[in-house]
Regions:
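Membrane-interface amphipathic segments in extracytoplasmic regions
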Residues: 1-214
């Protein structure tokens, strides 16, 4: 989602609290939010990009560099990044209508991007943040585990963040480690290796420090 008024480009990685952020940014963006039904028969918040008129869920860095090259380098690009184990459990439970199914999830992960996940962008967050050269072209990253920090990021730019206490679309209430049993932990580690290597995430949630973290 882009805001010319606030000179921001938000890269919405799936299952990182993005629906809430899009609602907050909506008054400052020419993009149009749409309530649609996707192929999993779940309600999802898509947007119509104002410039291309494309109906799109998760435009990546590559999308904005291609279609907004005139402003891309001058705007602040930001994203929320989530622990891969936590994110994939949340993602798969959302796809399965909130139900945990270890055997089914193992099958999905075995299929990787040839099955229910469409692309590497679905399984590895860094793929949404890199350009065609493989460079991670983002200015600010906020950890999902520190989601409320987005309030300070927005407030510094004059954006009303009062909706931030109502993060939407959450499907699992227990800690992700309670689900990562019977091989799931190791399977997610293998499938999400790009994220784990790039961000330095460990299973317990720690990640390496970088100047990009807000």
């Amino acid at each position: 989602m882009i805001s010319f008024e606030k000179r921001l480009i938000y890269i919405h990685i799936p299952k990182t609290g993005g629906y809430t952020l899009k609602k907050i940014l909506n008054p400052y963006s020419p993009d149009q939010l749409n309530q649609v039904t996707n192929r999993y028969n779940e309600s999802g918040l898509s947007m119509t990009d104002d410039r291309t008129k494309e109906d799109i869920f998760h435009p990546s860095v590559r999308f904005y560099k291609q279609h907004y090259s005139d402003v891309y380098e001058h705007f602040t690009k930001f994203a929320i990044v989530r622990n891969p184990w936590d994110r994939m459990i949340s993602y798969m439970m959302w796809l399965n209508k909130g139900k945990f199914d270890n055997e089914l999830f193992m099958t999905w992960l075995d299929l990787n991007t040839t099955g229910i996940f469409n692309s590497t962008e679905d399984v590895n967050q860094v793929s949404m943040l890199t350009d065609n050269t493989g460079k991670c072209d983002i200015d600010v990253m906020i950890k999902y585990s520190e989601f409320n920090k987005i309030m300070y990021f927005f407030e510094a730019r004059g954006i009303d963040s009062s909706l931030i206490t109502t993060k939407t679309n959450s499907v699992h209430k227990n800690h992700y480690t309670e689900y990562c049993q019977y091989g799931l932990k190791e399977k997610i580690e293998k499938v999400c290796k790009l994220d784990i290597d790039f961000f330095g995430f460990t299973y317990d949630g720690d990640c390496k420090e970088t100047a990009l973290w807000f």
